[in-house]
Regions:
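N-terminal pre-catalytic "stem/leader" segment of glycosyltransferase-like enzymes
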Residues: 1-73, 116
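Conserved catalytic-core segment of nucleotide-activated headgroup transferases in glycan assembly
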Residues: 18, 133-199
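Active-site regions of enzymes building and remodeling cell-envelope glycoconjugates
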Residues: 35-38, 48-53, 71-74, 103, ...
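Short loop/helix-cap segments at secondary-structure boundaries that form the rim of catalytic
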Residues: 43-47, 64-67, 116-120, 137-141, ...
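Short, polar loop motifs at secondary-structure junctions
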Residues: 57-60, 110-114, 175-184
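Short acidic active-site motifs
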Residues: 63, 95, 200-202
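Catalytic core of nucleotide-activated saccharide and alditol-phosphate transferases
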Residues: 67-161
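Acidic donor-binding loop of glycosyltransferase active sites
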Residues: 206-215
Length: 215
């Protein structure tokens, strides 16, 4: 494909080191492809054959034509479950949808996601699976009996479904504290919440549990 750049609201027009502590999927792909993470508005001076855009979770009103100033082709990369944009206010749902159609193609995580985006009318949908950079991660070294659920009680993470299944196991239940955690979750008596962590700390912590459930 040639020269690739990623674009997100957290981009600073620089590349990440391989030991970056918060290497979530989009950052991991930057590292694997030796590509910079660029800002959505403050464009870099260099030009790219392909720009891969991560639409901000809370502010989807991005301008693809602005990014095309420095990219020959534009792809939108799936962020979260494929239907998450339906939690936006109505105008933003249509804005997000229009951006999907305006992109040269869409990168999704799984074949099931591909079918969804094709059903929306996207002209070219390709699978770009979640990626993890393993360097520096701690192998499992504690064998506890607790069950970890994979997210909080919002549609993005499906925490309620995971919680109901975890209760059937009869073991202690632990949950992460994500950015969308609701305050009332602390009132659930049989869940112990971990503090908010960067990606590397979360993965190292996750590896210590007996069972993980994410539905």
């Amino acid at each position: 494909m040639g020269k690739i750049g990623f674009f997100s609201e957290t981009g600073n027009n620089q590349k990440y080191p391989r030991d970056f502590p918060n290497a979530r999927t989009e950052v991991a792909w930057c590292i694997a492809l030796d590509a910079p993470m660029c800002h959505l508005q403050k464009l870099p001076d260099e030009h790219f054959d392909l720009g891969i855009v991560i639409v901000p979770k809370n502010n989807p009103n991005i301008d693809l034509e602005h990014i095309r100033k420095v990219c020959d082709k534009i792809a939108i990369m799936q962020e979260g479950p494929h239907w998450y944009f339906q939690d936006y206010e109505l105008p933003n749902q249509f804005h997000y949808y229009n951006n999907l159609l305006e992109a040269d193609w869409v990168y999704c995580h799984n074949e099931s996601d591909r079918s969804y985006y094709e059903g929306l009318g996207c002209k070219d949908v390709r699978v770009m699976r979640s990626l993890m950079i393993p360097e520096g991660l701690i192998s499992r070294n504690e064998w506890g009996n607790a069950t970890i659920i994979g997210g909080n009680f919002v549609s993005w993470y499906g925490g309620f479904d995971s919680y109901i299944v975890a209760r059937q196991l009869g073991d202690p239940i632990v949950a992460p504290s994500m950015g969308r955690k609701q305050e009332q979750e602390n009132l659930i008596e049989d869940i112990q919440y971990l503090p908010y962590m960067n990606w590397r700390d979360w993965i190292n912590s996750l590896s210590q549990f007996n069972i993980g459930i994410h539905l």
